[in-house]
From Swiss-Prot:
Source organism of the structure: Xenopus laevis (African clawed frog)
Expression across tissues: In the mucociliary epithelium, specifically expressed in ciliated cells.
Organism placement in taxonomy: Eukaryota, Metazoa, Chordata, Craniata, Vertebrata
InterPro entries in UniProt: ODAD4, TPR-like_helical_dom_sf, TPR_rpt
General function of this protein: Component of the outer dynein arm-docking complex (ODA-DC) that mediates outer dynein arms (ODA) binding onto the doublet microtubule. Plays an essential role for the assembly of ODA-DC and in the docking of ODA in ciliary axoneme.
UniProt keyword list: Cell projection, Cytoplasm, Cytoskeleton, Repeat, TPR repeat
Protein's name according to its UniProt entry: Outer dynein arm-docking complex subunit 4
GO cellular component: cell projection; cytoplasm; cytoskeleton
Top-rank lineage group of the source organism: Eukaryota
Disruption phenotype: Morpholino knockdown of the protein causes disruption of the neural tube closure. Morphants show defects in ciliogenesis at early stages of embryonic development. More mature multiciliated cells display normal cilium length, but exhibit severe defects in ciliary beating, retaining only a twitching motility, but no organized beating. Outer dynein arms are absent in morphant axonemes.
Chain coiled-coil ranges: none
Primary gene name: odad4
Amino acid sequence: MAEETDEQQAPQSTFSTYMAEGEQLYHKAEYKKASDSFTAALQLQPEEKNCLVARSKCFLKLGEPECALKDAEASLQIENDFFKGLYQKAEALYAMGDFEFALVHYHRGYKLRPEFQGFRLGIQKAQEAIENSVGTPASVKLENKTDLQFISRQEESKKAKQKAQVKVQKKDSKQQKKVDPERSQKTVRQLLGELYSDKEYLESLLRDEALVKGNTRGGVKLHDLIINGILYLDTRSEFWRQQKPIYARQRDRKIMQQKWKRDKNKSADPSQYIVKSLEEIDQLLSSGKAEESYKKAQLVLKKVERWTSVDIHNREELTGSLHSCIGNAQMDMGQIEAALQSHKKDLAIAEKYKLLEAKSRALDNIGRVYARIGKFNEAIKVWEEKIPLANSSLEKTWLYHEIGRCYLELEQTAEAKEYGEKSQQEADAAEDIEWQLNACVLLAQAEVKLKHYQSAISSFENALERARLLHNKDAEQAILVALEDAKQGMEEQQESEQNNDENDNLRADGNTARDEEEEDVHVQRTEEDEG
């Protein structure tokens, strides 16, 4: 008994030992054991901020972003400007699908530690996630005087839609109809796929007032269960497909479906299997099952590689398409380098067999990978190669806008302005208000950096008009702030020019007086010499 007491009283290890053990386990990818070691260390020193961040990283790897967020916030309570805590909080928020709030913290950290590459990459990936997660590009990226701020918002319909999914629809919801257009519902349907019918079923249950008042046998309210189910589907649809807009994925899938349409009635032809497999691969990716999508695409690719061109026509084109699917899945899994190689394989096949549509797709994806990891020069080079292959005004306005953004990141402002103007022209041709808004903002940003304040004010005013047409209150408020900053910049520029003019006049007057004085001295000396 005494021996047991002695064992209980004796400390098992020191704080440093637990920390070292946790770090070793983390590097071995044994995240649960590493978390336990960090927990033991925190029992000895509960307010050790680096240990909190280390455990937060483990929770993130274990798929527990809420716990990761809790530890990150605890480290920030100890030190408000602890950059590791800020980064970890941003990463946790990103994993939870709260991209906009994650973006705020990436920017806070970048302002504190601009040399830390993680913040820069975080800004890039959060920005892209906000732009593409609901399927249509409706982001706004603004900059004010004090700090670079990306104010990216989806349509107002997104927020209205989320509220509508957890509350009973009211008959007089006229305002909601304005901000929840039919195309947004189509986007959600495409993102959820087969799960969309489940979502509709849950929403119908929510309208049954008698049902939602009941409880399960375990005492849990049915209302809460239904709400949680709907919220889960909302969260997943928000997070899925961050890298590529739905319209682009639809295009790729339709291309392949059209190629095989004439053969779909032949039961012995493998084209039926291929079309069905492509749909399943895309559906898995859209459902957030990137790893399953990847495995399915790999399986189909192996089968296709065993076939000959006699077995199946357009074999090479299909092979490239599967490499593209694999690359998209790898991007979602965070395997950036592997994704890049897969898309390059797609490009190589397209170039070898002169498949222009496939080449355009591959260049599109390669550019996205480069932009995501901050290699803006490489992204520009790839996307500029894609320009001749862009067929529609909508595709061109997106392409010019992305190239312009890359130039803006590289501080090559004149080029950013040039592509902003091109994007604006194509957006006008496409009559797409959302892209007109994006192009106007990009153009205004470039003009502010060039100190062309009058032009910037005009561009911001055009952007403001389009934000109001879209009923995008967030973008409207952000543009108003940027507009005031541009006006203030113009006033300061005018004051500076006026002061410079006055100084020039004073210098000119001083030079004249000095010349006259020197002339008088010269005359006086001449008279003295003559005397």
